[in-house]
Structures are given as structure tokens and as C-alpha cells.
Amino acid sequence: MKRLRNNIFATAAVAVACILGTTSAKAQEFTVQGDLVSSYVWRGVYQTGASFQPTLGFSIGDFSVTAWGSTDFDGNKSSEGLASKEIDLTAAYALGESGPTLSVASLWWAGQGAGKYFNFKSHETAHFFEAGLVYTLPCEKLPLSMAWYLMFAGADKNEDGKQNYSSYCELNYPFSVKSVDLNATVGFVPYKTLSLIHI
């Protein structure tokens, strides 16, 4: 397992080096952010109470990688068990300014002391691997964005141990009221799967 982990990190390092070496003329941007939230709701499903959610991101041209996390403040004193922990890693590529954005993500929220993070075996892993497609209409008066996310591998299994391919769709419309930026969002599950709670 240690050898597999080293191979994954080595491959990622080579890929990043190649990207940096071949696109040095493109703008590079680092993002460091931390949010405090009173409650954590993901895709309409309550996850935890007050949480700290750090973000670390890097983008170069149309390519970006993001590490995002979430942890509540209950720790071992939580009435529902051990503290909630989540780590999401995402790689995304935008196909031009008016094209769609494609993404691949590893979502892990097994929690404190549950599920080994570096276990990627199909029927043992606590990771959910998800592909995403986001498209924003190239219309200034109607900047509606549409997103489809599909869990294609990992812990999203049915009772028979087969992949569920759980999906989540979202429509988002940004607008302003008296210089205050707002978003109207509608999210839905296009079909029922046994692991609906994971969506």
C-alpha cells in the first residue's frame, strides 16, 4: 500500500511539473481560504453543526486543482459519535471561456478514526469518486449554469456490491439586489439510488 501511495504522489508530481513546464506563459493563481459555518448542508442534506472549512487551490490557465475540507468542533465529545471530518480533492478543466467545465473529484467523509484515507480498494474504500460537468449559458442577461455530477467509483455501492452511479443535478442563477450578490439554486436527484444519502 505504501508503494501504491508513493506511485500516486510521484505520478501527480510529474503531471504538475509537465503542466507548469509547458504552460509557463499562462496566469497562475493560488487560493487559500477558511470559512466558519453555523451548519454544514451539502446538496440539501444536513451534515453537521458549526464547522471550519479550509480551501487550498491552484490554477493555471484553464486547469485547476482544489483541496477542500470540513471539520466540526465536537471532537470526541460529539453526541453522535466521533467528530465529522471531510476531505475533497478536485481537478477541473474549463474548455475555453464559454465552454463547459469538466471535473473529477475524490470525496471522503468517513469521519474521525473511521475508514483509512489511503485505502482505495473497490469494496473497502471510504472514497466516493465523482465526475462533474458544468455549463453556463453564454448569455449576459441569462447566466444560468447547469451541473451534473455522477459518482462513478468508490463507496457508492448497492446491496449487491455493484456501483450505484448516483447522480445530482443543479441549476444556478446569479443575480444582484441593490449591489448584493445572490444565487437562486435548485438541486435534484434525477433517479433514485440506494445510497441517496451520499448525494
Predicted regions and their residues:
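Outer-envelope beta-barrel architecture signal
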Residues: 28-32, 50-52, 61-63, 87, ...
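Outer-membrane beta-barrel architecture
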Residues: 55-57, 90-92, 132-136, 168-174
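Cleavable N-terminal export/targeting peptides
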Residues: 1-29
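Outer-membrane beta-barrel initiation region
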Residues: 28-56
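Glycine- and aromatic-enriched membrane insertion/assembly motifs of diderm outer-membrane
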Residues: 48-106
